[in-house]
């Protein structure tokens, strides 16, 4: 998806197993943006034949084949660099603590995490501030909007499993591409809150609802407001802001640590259920017909101080091993369907994903821009 042009068909979707989404984000008109797609079922690019002449080593190449020839040569080049710097990867987000440890142990590469709580925009700002230093970020994990807006800052690279990533979830040359995604959800304490069938059902005396942060600053919180804005599959920021204004007015809006219900990505609410609260005290539901979904994109800095290690990192994240680590943390891998068809998907982990039904929606970029303008103008006055 090399351009920002977008259509408006965000309502229709196919069956849901991982995530199936119909949404126009860039370069497509009424096409599906899929985490779970037919196009994801083709075989990944194979490694070059052993009798094929190896290319000159190029750590900044746009593919394994063109720059390294074999995975072993990429691994050797990355090991010689010996380091990788990541930004905006908190350990509790989609299993990154384990993912970083596994990568470091497997390849003997020291991973330095800078500004782990950075937002996507702050990741880009951090890279600009640290540009030219050995500590500058090599790789990014970004929302789609930030990835598209900053594509010129990224190096093109197509991972080995490129063909398993839906065409609509990657920039054509490889400047950014999906690694995982999820649905917005409601996590709730069933001892105190009846299972909410909709976001509006949260407006109930005795319920304390929380967002994961400030929607003016945090993408997850903004997405939570927009999930509550859906009506018949159509986003309306005013509807979402009004819902939280009613919660605030009724004394039903609070902090996550005091909440009986939290609106957040399903992988975050599922992690809450699995740790601390326990499954008996915390459940996760994705309201039917109010299903908001999103991808998170990977990108390599064009100025990466450790270009081979950066490419090895992306190969690892999109490998079966890396994708299953995301799945273990309740995120939905970009290559999920292809892995399931090849019997390389962790079936036990997949069975633990929150169930979703209905037609998923992903906001196209013009819709995001319009909604953010509304939320920015009205949130402080109406919700505070």
Q: Model-predicted segments: where are they?
A:
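Sec-dependent bacterial lipoprotein signal peptides
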Residues: 2-38
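Bacterial lipoprotein signal-peptidase II cleavage site
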Residues: 41-51
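Conserved C-terminal helix/tail region of periplasmic/extracytoplasmic solute-binding proteins
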Residues: 55-59, 359-384
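Extracytoplasmic "Venus flytrap"
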Residues: 56-71, 79-98, 296
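Sec-exported extracytoplasmic/periplasmic mature domains
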Residues: 76-83, 101-109, 128-132, 145, ...
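Extracytoplasmic ligand-binding site segments that recognize negatively charged/polar headgroups
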Residues: 85-100, 112-128, 132-261, 272
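Periplasmic-binding protein-like
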Residues: 167-168, 181-185, 240-247, 277-307, ...
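Mature extracytoplasmic/periplasmic domains
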Residues: 292, 296, 301-363
């Amino acid at each position: 998806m090399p351009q920002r042009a977008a259509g408006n068909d965000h309502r229709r979707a196919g069956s849901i197993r991982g995530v199936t989404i119909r949404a126009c984000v860039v370069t497509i008109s009424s096409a599906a943006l899929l985490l779970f797609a037919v196009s994801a079922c083709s075989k990944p690019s194979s490694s070059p034949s052993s009798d094929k002449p190896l290319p000159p080593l190029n750590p900044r190449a746009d593919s394994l084949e063109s720059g390294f020839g074999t995975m072993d040569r990429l691994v050797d080049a990355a090991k010689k660099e010996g380091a990788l710097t990541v930004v905006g990867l908190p350990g509790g987000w989609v299993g990154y603590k384990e993912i970083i440890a596994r990568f470091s142990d497997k390849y003997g590469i020291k991973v330095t995490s800078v500004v782990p709580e950075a937002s996507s925009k702050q990741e880009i700002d951090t890279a600009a501030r640290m540009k030219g230093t050995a500590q500058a970020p090599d790789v990014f994990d970004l929302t789609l909007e930030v990835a598209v807006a900053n594509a010129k800052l990224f190096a093109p690279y197509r991972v080995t499993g490129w063909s398993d990533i839906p065409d609509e979830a990657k920039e054509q040359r490889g400047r950014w591409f999906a690694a995982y995604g999820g649905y917005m959800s409601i996590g709730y304490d069933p001892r105190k809150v009846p299972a909410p069938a909709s976001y509006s059902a949260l407006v109930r005396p005795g319920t304390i609802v929380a967002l994961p942060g400030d929607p003016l600053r945090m993408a997850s919180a903004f997405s939570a407001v927009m999930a509550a804005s859906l009506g018949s599959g159509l986003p309306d920021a005013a509807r979402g802001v009004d819902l939280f204004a009613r919660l605030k007015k009724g004394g039903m809006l609070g902090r996550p640590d005091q909440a009986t219900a939290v609106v957040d990505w399903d992988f975050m609410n599922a992690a809450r259920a699995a740790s601390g609260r326990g499954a008996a005290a915390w459940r996760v539901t994705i309201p039917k017909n109010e299903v908001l979904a999103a991808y998170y994109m990977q990108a390599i800095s064009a100025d990466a101080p450790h270009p081979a290690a950066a490419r090895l990192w992306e190969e690892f994240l999109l490998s079966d091993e890396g994708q299953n680590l995301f799945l273990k943390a309740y995120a939905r891998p970009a290559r999920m369907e292809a892995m399931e068809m090849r019997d390389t998907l962790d079936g036990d982990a997949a069975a633990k994903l929150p169930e979703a039904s209905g037609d998923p929606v992903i906001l196209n970029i013009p819709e995001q821009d319009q909604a953010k303008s509304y939320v920015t103008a009205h949130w402080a006055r109406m919700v505070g």
